[in-house]
């Protein structure tokens, strides 16, 4: 459960530019 949430958060962070 937690792993899925962490993966989703990481994907969102990677998709959005972190300038």
Swiss-Prot record:
Pfam families for this protein: Ibs_toxin
Gene deletion effect: None seen. An isbE overproducing strain cannot be made in the absence of the sibE gene.
GO biological process: programmed cell death
InterPro entries: Toxin_Ibs
Sorted UniProt keywords: Toxin-antitoxin system
Disulfide bond entries: none
Induction: The sibE sRNA probably represses expression of ibsE mRNA, either by destabilizing the transcript and/or preventing its translation. Expression of the proteinaceous toxin is controlled by antisense sRNA SibE.
Note: Part of the SIBe repeat region, encoded on the opposite strand from the sibE RNA.
Protein role: Toxic component of a type I toxin-antitoxin (TA) system. Overexpression causes cessation of growth.
Family listed: Belongs to the Ibs toxic protein family.
Protein's name in the database: Small toxic protein IbsE
Organism in which the protein naturally occurs: Escherichia coli (strain K12)
């Amino acid at each position: 459960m937690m792993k899925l949430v962490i993966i989703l958060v990481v994907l969102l962070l990677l998709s959005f530019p972190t300038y």
